[in-house]
Each structure stands twice: as C-alpha cells, then as structure tokens.
C-alpha cells in the first residue's frame, strides 16, 4: 500500500507558518484598504509640486566647473613658441546636479516601495490558491490573471531602477569626457542633455507609479471575492 505523500511539520513549525500567514493577510488587507488610496492621493499631490512641473528645462542645468583652455596658437607664431607646451587646466571636484538629485531622493523610495508591495500582493495571492483538483477553477484562473498583471507591474518598476542607474553611468561618462576633452563643447552640452532627459523620465515614473497603484486597486478590489474565495466557499473575511 502506497504511503500518503505530504509535508510533515512539527507543531511549533506549523504554528510559526500560521503566524506568518496571518501577518501576511493582515498586511495585504492594510495595503488594499488604507495604503493604496493614500498612496494614490500622495502621488497625485506630488505631481502638482513645482519641482515636477518645470517648463524651462534650461533651469535644470548644473554649473560645470571645467576650465576652458586657451585657443591653439596661430600658424605664423615662431617655432620656439610652438615648442612651449601649455598644460591643460585641471578641473576640481565636480558634484552632481543638485536639482536632479533632490528629485531622485523623492522618486527612488517610491520605486522601491511599489516593488515591495508587488511582492506582498504576489505572496498573498499565492497563499490563497487552493489545492489543485477537479471542479470549479474559474476563481483560480482569476487569481492567475491578477498575478500575471502584478508581475508585469513589478517588471516595469524594476526597469525604473535600471533607468536611474543608467542616468548616473551615462552622466558620469559625459562629465569625464567633458573634463578630459575640455575644448569639445559638445561633451558639456551632453551633460546638460542627460539632466534634462532624466527630468522627463522621473516625472513619467511618478505618473506611472500613480497609474500602477490605481490599477492594482481596481484589479484587486474588482476581483476580491474570487481572489480570496476562488472555490466559492464561505469565508468570513478577505482571508
């Protein structure tokens, strides 16, 4: 006779798992009913701030303390003068763009928060998926669709983190080139172009973050009954 298969846990381990599940469900409930609406309102207010409504992008430019070298000598100068090499003036400490850094200080935590909340929702729904068996699986299909969408949001948020890291890398390269090739003005212009471009990226990120939270609220609240009770069983709460 075949032995029944299953995971056997000690009484203490089962208790700890149950505590984890209860805490998870409470976090999910708080996220849906309190955190989500408050976060949508906050991001909406943030988008009304002057710092996210700059019309003159030139005002975002940070000063580049990179000395401009003297023009090259004329052809008719004496040969002895040409042989006298002048050292290229060196630049000192080059800070980042303070205005952009201030915006990043606001946006980066929001990106991290949404990523963590997506993980929370994914874990919560995964713990609500019932035992796989014959019967009415319509609710399970809804759970899977919601999971698919939340994972898609998480992937897009992770792309925001890549965009932010890429900004520092590309701006750093542009500053390095501008400080090395001090006579090439295009490298200086490239630094300003990166600052202006990332400003648009950061505003778009906040717009997307607000939209993602609104989407999560809609898709979860609209399908909450099937998410928490996929088999149509009687349950007193959202878990």
UniProtKB/Swiss-Prot annotation:
Q: Tell me the segments the record calls region Disordered.
A: 65-86
- Provide the alphabetized UniProt keywords: Acetylation, Phosphoprotein, Proteasome
Q: Output compositional bias ranges, type Basic and acidic residues.
A: 72-86
**What residues bear Phosphoserine in this entry?**
10
What processes does the entry annotate via GO biological process terms? regulation of G1/S transition of mitotic cell cycle; regulation of proteasomal protein catabolic process
GO cellular component: a single term = nucleoplasm
Query: Acetylation: is it a keyword of this entry?
Result: yes
Q: At what positions is N-acetylalanine found?
A: 2
| Xref: Pfam families | PA28_C, PA28_N
GO molecular function per UniProt:
endopeptidase activator activity
Q: Which InterPro entries match?
A: PA28_C (IPR003186), PA28_C_sf (IPR036997), PA28_N_sf (IPR036996), Proteasome_activ_PA28 (IPR009077), Proteasome_activ_PA28_N (IPR003185), Proteasome_activ_sf (IPR036252)
Family affiliation: Belongs to the PA28 family.
Q: What job does this protein perform?
A: Implicated in immunoproteasome assembly and required for efficient antigen processing. The PA28 activator complex enhances the generation of class I binding peptides by altering the cleavage pattern of the proteasome.
Q: How does it assemble?
A: Heterodimer of PSME1 and PSME2, which forms a hexameric ring.
Q: What is this protein called?
A: Proteasome activator complex subunit 2
Please state the gene responsible for encoding this protein: PSME2
